[in-house]
Amino acid sequence: MLDDRAKLLLKALIERYIADGQPVGSRTLSRSSGLDLSPATIRNVMADLEDIGLIASPHTSAGRIPTAKGYRLFVDTMLTVQRGELCSPELAPDQPQKVIANAAQLLSSLSQFVGVVMAPRRPSVFRHIEFLRLSERRLLVIIVSPDGDVQNRVIFTEVDHSQSQLAEAANFLNSHYSGLGMEEVRERLKTEVDQLRGEIASLMQAAVNVGSEAMAASQEEVVISGERNLLALSDFSNDMGNLRKAFDLFEQKTQILRLLDVSNRAEGVRIFIGGESQVVPFEELSVVSAPYEVDGQVVGTLGVIGPTRMPYDRMIQIVDITSKLVTNALSHRR
C-alpha cells in the first residue's frame, strides 16, 4: 500500500508527464507537487515507486516516467473526471454508415488521437427487392434494407427474362419474405420452389445469393479516423518502429475489432492501458472505449486510441458523450 505522500507524488508526476511528455525529476516535483518536501526526500519516494514498478527511469534522463502499472493505479484511484467541461457536439440522425463515420471523425477531432467505431451488428435483412432488365440475360438487382440502405448489383442469368417475369419474381419475394434474413430466405426457397417455375426459382436463388453478399459487404466492421494525428505526437514521431506498428494495427483492423468486441460486453467506459488487454499487445498505446445502443440493445462499441500518455479524464468524457450521441442518433433516426 502507498502512503498519502507517495500517492500525491505519483499523481503529480503522472499529471506533469501527461502535460509535457518530459521525464519528471525530483526538483520539478518539489516545485509542482504542493508538498513541503525537499528534493532529496522526493528522490527517496521516487526510488520506492520505481522499486514497485509504478515509474521507470529512461536511460537518457535523470527523471522518471509512469509505467503501465502506474497509469492503471492513477486511473483507478486518483482520476477525477469533471463532467460537463466539453462543449456539446452534435451528431444528427442519419443512415447508420453515415452516423458511424461521423462518430469516428468526432472522436478523432475532439481527442486529437485516433477515433474508432465498430459498426452495429445487424442481420442481412431485406425490406424490398426489385429487378430491372438491363439487356439480354443481364439484370440489375435493387435491394433495400429495413433502415433504408440501398444496394445495387448486376447479375447474369442463364436465360433471358421479360420485365413481367422479373416483376413476378420480385412480387413473390416481397410478399413472402420481406423482413427476413437472407439466409432464412435461401433455406425457405429450397423447400418452396415447387410452386414456382424453374427459371423464376433460379432467378430468385441468384438474387438472394448476390443480395446476401452485397449486404454483408456493406457492413464495414470498424471505421477508423485520425491515424495521421499520431504523426504529431513525439511518442510516435521520434520512434519509427512504434509508428509503423501502430499503422499496421490500424490497417489490419482485426485486433482493434477484437478489442472493441471485448468492450461490447461491458457496461460504461473501459480503459485498456498498454498491453494489458492482451488483445492489442502494444505497450505504447491505450484505448478508452464504451458501448452504444439502438433501442435499448447494445449493438457496437466506439473509442479513442492514443499514447499511454493521454489525458484520461478528458478521453473518458469524449468517449462517454460520443457513445450517448451515437445511441441517440441511431435510435431516433427517421
UniProtKB/Swiss-Prot annotation:
Keyword Repressor attached: yes
Molecular-function GO terms, alphabetical: DNA binding
Gene Ontology biological process: negative regulation of DNA-templated transcription
Transmembrane spans: none
Keyword presence, Chaperone: no
Family recorded in the similarity comment: Belongs to the HrcA family.
Function summary: Negative regulator of class I heat shock genes (grpE-dnaK-dnaJ and groELS operons). Prevents heat-shock induction of these operons.
Name the UniProt record assigns to this protein: Heat-inducible transcription repressor HrcA
